[in-house]
A protein has these predicted regions:
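General small-molecule cofactor/ligand-binding pocket signal
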Residues: 14-16, 55-59, 111, 164-166, ...
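A short, basic/flexible loop-to-alpha-helix module at the beginning of a structural domain
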Residues: 120-130
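Structural beta-alpha unit
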Residues: 44-80, 119-120, 197-228, 233-238
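Small/aliphatic-rich secondary-structure junction motif
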Residues: 1-29, 131-179, 194-201, 253
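Well-ordered alpha-helical segments embedded in enzymatic catalytic cores
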Residues: 67, 149-150, 188, 215
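Short, well-ordered secondary-structure micro-motifs
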Residues: 26-27, 93, 122-123, 150-151, ...
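Short, surface-exposed alpha-helical segments at coil->helix boundaries
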Residues: 29-40, 179-190
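Gly/Ser-rich helix-loop-strand patches that form or flank binding pockets
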Residues: 5-6, 72-122, 221-264
Length: 264
């Protein structure tokens, strides 16, 4: 809750709890009542932390992911914020099924916070991932216009201090071919970075080599970015995978918060 209150620009929060229809009918009433008591207590906490408007919804729905998306659309929300909450044996490695479904099916922007990180944050680290979550953002791009949507949207946010546009070369038949790709990509990336107007953010680019998802997440860790941002698209290197699978894999493996921006 503290982290939501410290995200920049938050004016209204709608807290949603879904009770699945797979729960025994005899228990649902008590589950709804218990959830409502808990969520209203958390709403009071957010109010006390400075959020101007906090509303709560507890509903019974056959699909938690669809229920969350319905609530977001009904309230005209700009973004859905969720935890990764996977149940992998290795904690934090996998997206929870609800988060994964929202990622695939919703048209809303989605911010996925890594539960194991947020739960242990304190002091300087807490400050990085909450009020300064947009301070240093890594964006995987290719040379298509569609993949630069995230860079253009982030550049409009005053809180963003640095944007790193990362281009990954995942294959090459020879060293000469790789060098040619690097030169071509470098020229295009430099040109595109210069063309994006910002609210003060510095935009720089990097060329990486290796598996797309693995290299992006490794570089995010190496450079200690505050956020990784992506736009699901069917063009460019994303076309080589099932639509949406790149964003899903990126979010699944990430140790950093992941922001998924939907195209208009």
């Amino acid at each position: 809750m503290d982290c939501i209150a410290d995200l920049p620009g938050v004016m209204e929060v709608v807290m949603v709890h879904i009770v699945g229809t797979n729960k025994p009918a005899s228990l649902r009433s008590d589950m709804v009542s218990s959830a409502r008591t808990r969520i209203e207590s958390e709403a009071t906490l957010l109010n006390n932390l400075g959020i101007p408007s906090v509303r709560t919804e507890v509903m019974v729905h056959e699909s938690p992911a669809a229920g969350i998306d319905d609530a977001a659309n009904r309230n005209n929300s700009d973004i859905i914020v969720m935890g990764a909450r996977g149940k992998s044996i290795i904690k934090g490695l996998r997206l929870g099924s609800v988060t994964q479904k929202v990622l695939h099916e919703s048209k809303k922007n989605l911010l996925i916070m890594r539960g194991p990180i947020i739960e242990t944050l304190s002091g300087e680290k807490f400050q990085k991932y909450c009020p300064l979550i947009f301070s240093r953002v890594l964006v995987p791009v290719d040379l298509t216009t569609e993949s630069w949507t995230a860079v253009e949207q982030l550049a409009k946010i005053p809180d963003v201090q640095e944007i790193i546009a990362a281009f990954v070369i995942s294959r090459g038949e020879s060293e000469q071919e790789i060098e040619r790709l690097k030169q071509q990509a470098g020229d295009e990336l430099e040109k595109k970075c210069r063309q994006v107007p910002t609210k003060g953010a510095e935009i720089r680019w990097r060329i990486l080599e290796g598996d797309l998802v693995t290299r992006i997440n490794d570089y995010a860790q190496e450079t200690d970015v505050s956020l990784v941002c992506t736009v699901p698209t069917e063009k460019g290197f994303f076309a080589e995978m099932l639509h949406g699978s790149f964003s899903c894999e990126l979010a699944r493996q990430a140790t950093k918060p992941v922001l998924v921006i939907r195209r208009p």
